[in-house]
Amino acid sequence: MHVLIAGAGLGGLTLAQNLRKRGISYEIFERDEHKDARFQGWAIALHTITDELVASMPSDMPDLRQATDHMSPLKIPTQICLYPAESNVRVGWEDCPETPFIRAERYRLRNHLATNIPIQWGKRVQRIEHDDQGVAVYFEDGTGAKGDILVGADGVKSVVRQQLLQKSHDEVLKIIPLAAIVGELKLSGEAFKRQLQLSHGSYSLIDSEKGYLTFCSLHDVAPDGKSARYYWIMSRSDPTIADPDHWLHKATQQEKLDHAREVMSNREPKFREIFDLTPVEGVKKETHIWRDLELSSLPAGRVVLMGDAAHVMTPFRGEGGYNTFIDAMALAKILDRLDKEDKTHDIESIKNSVNEYNAEMLERGVKSVQLSREWVDGSKVNSKKPLLAPMKVIPFSEVPLEVAA
């Protein structure tokens, strides 16, 4: 069996590692020209399936936590906290034996997953061909590849999905009624320490009355442990966000920052500080429009979808990456079975196996898409059940800025 993977993001690379461990032939193609071509995102929570994920990969991989933990080099456990507006109690999760998890910095995570993977860069999919005998993918640079299975791991605006379904992105992607302002900043000294006291990692400020859900998070810590990059996303439900005349599409960075500070004006100074310290140039100029994807079915054949190409969702429940990793591990098992049973050229066996994968993947993915969409409404977020585990009260404690050896 020879597997073609379009997309060297978290999902495509995880699948490649799973295939590498099983000795299954593969090629992986990425549209970016190199690994630093574009921003990879901030941080992602790895939880509940971390042990399974590590076990699914070859033994020559570096330690996942050491390679990706966004708290490194600080010797404190990461936390995910929530602060309801009507309460002074902090609830959430802390990395511990009862609720183990990693907040992985996404650039480090992608590099980790790329260990010993020969990524072919600058390969933007132009078109695909598939029939009962095999698959072929052709790229904008004039090259192409042929194989037995093509996996579309090429993200939200998947060309593989578009070609497989013969539907445009606008036909299948739903605009999320979510207006958001995003800011970034660097903190050091006492300001850094005060943020760590609010959470060793990330925290959400829930304002049920105003309908705002604001997520603040550490991105990564400097090598000396004395400063860190932070980011925040202030969002609320807004069905008019796609209107080109929406005020956010025309607002200056200063106007967006002023709005965020006004929304936070009734909160305690410790919660206002991260917004007060955000420089104007740290506010994102563009207004991001989130989209999600619910597919009721997919064709079963030699072209398979996974990750955001199959079930993109909002980031607020932390389930996008979780589902992508499950997709990769599940698909690897299906392909391994076909390979071992020598069914690579048996189209009926391939259809049955891909049907099995699609059914489970879509049911799980659609459920997460729907639950993630509900979190958009800040007035309802208090009633939502998280994936990781029941939230617990997290008491406050002093934060020693001790750096690991």
From Swiss-Prot:
User: Which Pfam family, giving just one, matches this sequence?
Assistant: FAD_binding_3
The cross-references to SUPFAM superfamilies, in alphabetical order and at most eight, read:
FAD/NAD(P)-binding domain
Question: Which Gene3D superfamilies does this one have?
Answer: FAD/NAD(P)-binding domain
Q: Which cofactor does it need?
A: FAD
InterPro entries listed in its UniProt record: FAD-bd, FAD/NAD-bd_sf
So what EC number does this one have? 1.-.-.-
A GO molecular function held by the record: FAD binding
> Which residues does FAD bind?
E30, A45, R106, D308, G321
Q: Does the entry feature the keyword Cell cycle, yes or no? A: no
Alphabetized, the UniProt keywords read: FAD, Flavoprotein, Monooxygenase, Oxidoreductase
Family statement: Belongs to the paxM FAD-dependent monooxygenase family.
Q: Identify the PANTHER family for this entry.
A: FAD-BINDING DOMAIN-CONTAINING PROTEIN, MONOOXYGENASE, FAD-BINDING
Say what the protein does.
FAD-dependent monooxygenase; part of the gene cluster that produces the tetronate natural products trihazones. Transcription analysis of thnD confirmed this gene is expressed, hence its role in the biosynthetic pathway remains cryptic. The pathway begins with the formation of trihazone A by the hybrid PKS-NRPS synthetase thnA and the trans-enoyl reductase thnE. Trihazone A is further decarboxylated by the 2-oxoglutarate-dependent dioxygenase thnC to produce trihazone D. The function of the FAD-dependent monooxygenase thnD has still to be identified.
- The protein's name in its UniProt record: FAD-dependent monooxygenase thnD
From the broadest rank down, the organism's phylogenetic lineage runs: Eukaryota, Fungi, Dikarya, Ascomycota, Pezizomycotina
